[in-house]
């Protein structure tokens, strides 16, 4: 089951070079027909190319390769449509589609019986139902006007998509490179650190949800200053929610953590404290990075990820060997803070706002919450 899911994720990763989150930005700037056609053709290539790789290197059981290719293609289409809905700020359809897909998958899986073959069938059924609905939801938005801009749209989509995917890969190193350093330096205590990280990273859920809404709004906003002011509102809201979530996490008794994860997982609290600056930095970075995505400055995301990688590359081993798991949390926080700082400076330079306008929220939080509609 895990190999099939991994194979599907590889197909989607290649597809996202053209049909990924860049569609949110481009959906209000390029003809939708051209965007969809380019994304569909690229998703076919992604499924066939990655399917061949999976088969040739035997990364997926041979009798499930065709299923993996098919499901991967369906998930690519599903992802493409969802990115377009975000770009259209059609949150109702976007959220319902994701919910329906999961519900259908679970129901079919339970009805057929819990086997690997039935898991595959459940995935197929869930994506077919969701895709059928998404096609109907999109049909009114499609307008056939003039020639299909295949080549120009492909070039633009690929350049943006490549920058996004490359920054995601570097950011993944920022998130997880410290794991390898801990494993090499300290051995069996990695599990304790991973639990602390999972607890801390769960606090990113609100900021990530807010950032997706922000991305859609900024991509459709014409006035530059309004884009900046929207971002400031989301920054303050993300800061508030993350602060509250951090306080709650700090107050959770250590006994609860031991009861949930086992008595061997002790000493997570100091690590969580060390990660707190990093948690807040990533929460704020979500708003900065989605502003830059909304104005088409994807290259800055890659630079920010590389800036964040510097502390871990140069000081990661020293922090772990000298201060243990707390040191790992500290250097991780420094890494995230470096990225956040860079993104903040870029936002300040592009926004046209004064430092006071960024730091002081003009409207109340109740007014800011209305932006979520």
Language model features: what each stretch is:
Residues 8, 12-30, 200-225, 291-294:
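Helix-loop junctions and terminal segments of transmembrane helices
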Residues 34-37, 64-67, 93, 156-163, ...:
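Membrane-interface "helix-start" segments
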Residues 100-101, 122-141, 150-216, 278, ...:
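Transmembrane helical elements of multi-pass membrane transporters/channels
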């Amino acid at each position: 089951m895990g190999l099939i899911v991994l194979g599907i994720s590889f197909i989607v990763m290649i597809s996202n070079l053209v049909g990924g989150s860049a569609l949110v930005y481009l959906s209000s700037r390029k003809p939708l027909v051209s965007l969809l056609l380019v994304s569909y053709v690229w998703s076919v290539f992604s499924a066939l190319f990655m399917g061949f790789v999976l088969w040739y290197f035997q990364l997926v059981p041979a009798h499930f390769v065709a299923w993996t290719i098919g499901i991967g293609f369906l998930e690519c289409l599903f992802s493409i449509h969802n990115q377009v809905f975000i770009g259209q700020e059609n949150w109702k359809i976007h959220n319902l589609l994701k919910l329906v897909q999961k519900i259908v998958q679970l129901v079919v899986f339970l009805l057929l019986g819990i086997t690997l073959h039935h898991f595959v069938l459940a995935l197929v059924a869930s994506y077919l139902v969701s895709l059928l609905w998404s096609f109907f939801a999109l049909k009114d938005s499609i307008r056939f006007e003039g020639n299909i801009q295949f080549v120009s749209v492909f070039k633009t989509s690929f350049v943006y998509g490549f920058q996004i995917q490359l920054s995601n890969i570097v950011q993944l190193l920022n998130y997880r490179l410290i794991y390898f350093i801990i494993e090499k330096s300290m051995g069996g205590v990695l599990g304790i650190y991973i639990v602390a990280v999972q607890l801390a990273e769960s606090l990113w859920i609100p900021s990530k949800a807010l950032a997706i809404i922000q991305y859609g709004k900024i991509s459709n906003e014409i006035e530059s200053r309004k884009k900046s002011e929207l971002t400031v509102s989301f920054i303050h809201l993300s800061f508030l929610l993350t602060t509250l979530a951090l306080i709650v996490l700090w107050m959770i008794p250590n006994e609860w953590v031991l009861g949930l994860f086992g008595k061997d997982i002790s000493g997570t609290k100091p690590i969580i404290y060390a990660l707190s600056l990093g948690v807040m930095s990533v929460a704020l970075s979500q708003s900065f990075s989605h502003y830059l995505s909304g104005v088409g400055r994807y290259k800055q995301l890659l630079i920010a990820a590389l800036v964040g990688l510097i502390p871990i590359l140069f000081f990661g081993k020293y922090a772990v060997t000298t201060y243990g798991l707390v040191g790992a949390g500290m250097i991780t926080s420094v890494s995230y803070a470096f990225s956040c700082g860079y993104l903040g400076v870029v936002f300040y330079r592009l926004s046209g706002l004064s430092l006071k306008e960024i730091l002081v929220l003009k409207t109340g939080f109740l007014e800011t919450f209305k932006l979520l509609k």
